[in-house]
């Protein structure tokens, strides 16, 4: 009886304390089976589809500005996409051509000022040239992804950052922005309607004529 009691007690102790497995930081996926999110791989996989999506919905910039009549948010239902379903910031996809009046790289958030062909309105048209890119209009304009495709806000933000990295490498630097002053360009891009005086466009396609 004493031996049986000892065996039972030992078994109870094992069940009570359980078995603890130490998992090293960075090796969690081996235990859980969950693959760590890689924003660079994610964006590389959707990049060409993303460009096609934006190019397919882009509105001619002169047409857009004329229809807006000085109120960029007024075309939200016709051309825009909200950042949060039916609310939040409004982003648009546009395309056009024009002459580069100025290339400004005094700050890291560089830009070009473009005089668009076919439009003489007061709005200032800027195209971002990096190295820092403001906003998230490229991501927010896309119809092929949304926040629900990602686990958390960190992943969603990382997608926007990687889109900007891809744009900087494949689109902007490939066009050698420092050499573009006075030249004619064509572009496809996105912008968020933050005001009515200025459009800050993030290009997904930029060609020098």
Residue ranges and their predicted role:
Residues 1-17:
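Sec-dependent bacterial lipoprotein signal peptides
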